[in-house]
């Protein structure tokens, strides 16, 4: 429809081939992501600001703000939801629920769900909510108060109180209802059979800064679960994936959250002793489809769902401790020559202790037993009369010497 504005998003190669030609007599404008010198978050930030400046502003001037009718609810924009960001559908659904729960209404969701002809209506909101800290530039341009979408119980409560203060609303009735409704399962999960492991079940997370900071703050700050490491993927910088692989090998967190990269690094550890850590998708890239609205991470509903996933991950870890029947049948018989009084050198025992310390507390007993039997069998097979340090280090695999030095 030539009467409606339209945008064609092109890439560098298409621009070189097409020469930037725009059909005459159309309202098509071109937006070129700088695919060579910026990442997807920088491109998203620039695209959102460009769309508003091109289709919302008039010659660089802000459009006039429509006065809110007497008695109408305060209005809020939600900025950031778009294809290609992790868990967007569920988190958007939860943020909308929070906004409407305290008595406000959503003015616009930008860019997903917004039309180019509606860009000038962005200024009609009384406040803005930025869902992802990686691209918040449009909130600065709009000039209204804005808040970061929350993750965790305490953060959500603080968010609602601040939003209520900005909009002139009382969020306390909604906050008081949450423990008896949305947050009620948190109590059940916290008192479940996995409660014995919360104090020792460490976790690691590698995700965009929005999720890495928020999830760590919730699990470690609100709930007290020990965090082995948290690596944030930030706009404008490249993640050191080799360092991430090293952190996973060094700490062996019982629960690992991340992208397909971290899932691959986790698979590399399967040859080791002890149970396998559980993986929870928390970032792109990865083959994780999250189009349903039942898997939030943000808000009160996100606090409930996230704790549920951690509990399920702990059950998975317990499952891996148990040997499968087929594995027991196919395993080699225990050598009768193994003796509990088989002599060990002191440095060999120290090396074994260092390996066991890499395992979560929950799984150390089974890991220590398996490693000790494997070391003694290797020594007997080699015709040795005692277990030496080199035998233990050989069980750990390549690179153990470097990690051993780090732990000393």
Curated annotation (Swiss-Prot):
Pathway terms, separated by semicolons: Porphyrin-containing compound metabolism; bacteriochlorophyll biosynthesis
SUPFAM superfamilies hit by this protein: Helical backbone' metal receptor (SSF53807)
Pfam families linked to this entry: Oxidored_nitro, PCP_red
Recorded GO MF terms: oxidoreductase activity, acting on iron-sulfur proteins as donors
Keywords: Bacteriochlorophyll biosynthesis, Chlorophyll biosynthesis, Oxidoreductase, Photosynthesis
Alphabetical list of InterPro entries matching this protein: BchZ (IPR010244), ChlB/BchB/BchZ (IPR050152), LI-POR_suB-like_C (IPR013580), Nase/OxRdtase_comp1 (IPR000510)
Gene3D superfamilies found in the cross-reference section: Nitrogenase molybdenum iron protein domain (3.40.50.1980)
EC number(s) reported in the record: 1.3.7.15
Record-level GO BP terms: bacteriochlorophyll biosynthetic process; photosynthesis
Coiled coil regions, renumbered to chain: none
EC class (word): oxidoreductase
Recorded catalytic activity of this chain's protein: 3-deacetyl-3-vinylbacteriochlorophyllide a + 2 oxidized [2Fe-2S]-[ferredoxin] + ADP + phosphate = chlorophyllide a + 2 reduced [2Fe-2S]-[ferredoxin] + ATP + H2O + H(+); bacteriochlorophyllide a + 2 oxidized [2Fe-2S]-[ferredoxin] + ADP + phosphate = 3-acetyl-3-devinylchlorophyllide a + 2 reduced [2Fe-2S]-[ferredoxin] + ATP + H2O + H(+); 3-deacetyl-3-(1-hydroxyethyl)bacteriochlorophyllide a + 2 oxidized [2Fe-2S]-[ferredoxin] + ADP + phosphate = 3-devinyl-3-(1-hydroxyethyl)chlorophyllide a + 2 reduced [2Fe-2S]-[ferredoxin] + ATP + H2O + H(+)
Family: Belongs to the ChlB/BchB/BchZ family.
Subunit structure: Chlorophyllide reductase is composed of three subunits; BchX, BchY and BchZ. Forms a heterodimer of one BchY and one BchZ subunit.
Reported function: Converts chlorophylls (Chl) into bacteriochlorophylls (BChl) by reducing ring B of the tetrapyrrole.
Name of the featured protein: Chlorophyllide reductase subunit Z
Species annotation: Cereibacter sphaeroides
């Amino acid at each position: 429809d030539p009467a409606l504005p339209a945008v064609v998003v092109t890439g560098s190669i298409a621009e070189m081939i097409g020469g930037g030609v725009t059909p005459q007599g159309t309202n098509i404008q071109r937006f070129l992501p700088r695919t060579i010198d910026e990442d997807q978050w920088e491109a998203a930030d620039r695209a959102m600001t460009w769309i508003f400046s091109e289709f919302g502003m008039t010659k660089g001037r802000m459009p006039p703000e429509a006065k809110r009718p007497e008695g109408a609810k305060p209005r809020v924009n939600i900025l950031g939801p778009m294809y290609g960001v992790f868990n967007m559908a569920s988190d958007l659904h939860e943020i909308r629920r929070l906004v409407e729960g305290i008595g406000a209404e959503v003015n616009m969701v930008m860019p997903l769900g917004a039309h180019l002809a509606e860009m000038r209506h962005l200024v009609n909101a009384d406040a803005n909510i930025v869902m992802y800290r990686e691209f918040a530039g449009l909130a600065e341009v709009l000039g209204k108060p804005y808040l970061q979408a929350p993750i965790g119980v305490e953060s959500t409560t603080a968010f609602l109180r601040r939003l209520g203060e900005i909009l002139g609303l009382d969020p306390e009735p909604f906050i008081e209802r949450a423990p008896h409704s949305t947050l009620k399962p948190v109590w059940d999960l916290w008192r479940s059979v996995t409660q014995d492991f919360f104090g020792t079940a460490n976790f690691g997370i590698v995700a965009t800064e929005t999720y890495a900071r928020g999830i760590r703050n919730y699990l470690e700050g609100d709930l007290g679960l020990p965090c082995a490491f948290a690596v944030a993927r930030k706009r404008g910088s490249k993640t050191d994936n080799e360092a991430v692989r090293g952190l996973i090998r060094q700490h062996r967190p019982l629960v690992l959250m991340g992208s397909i990269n971290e899932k691959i690094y986790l698979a590399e550890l399967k040859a080791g002793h002890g149970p396998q850590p559980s993986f929870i998708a928390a970032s792109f890239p990865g083959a994780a489809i999250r189009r349903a609205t039942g898997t939030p991470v943000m808000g009160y509903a996100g606090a409930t769902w996230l704790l549920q996933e951690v509990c399920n991950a702990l059950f998975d870890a317990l499952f891996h401790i148990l040997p499968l029947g087929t594995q027991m049948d196919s395993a080699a018989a225990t050598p009768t020559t193994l003796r509990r009084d088989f002599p060990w050198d002191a440095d060999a025992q120290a090396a074994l202790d260092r390996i066991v310390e890499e395992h979560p507390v929950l799984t150390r007993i089974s890991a220590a037993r398996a490693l000790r039997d494997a070391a003694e069998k290797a020594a007997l097979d080699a015709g040795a009369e005692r277990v030496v340090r080199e035998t233990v280090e050989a069980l750990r695999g390549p690179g153990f010497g470097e990690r051993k030095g780090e732990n000393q």
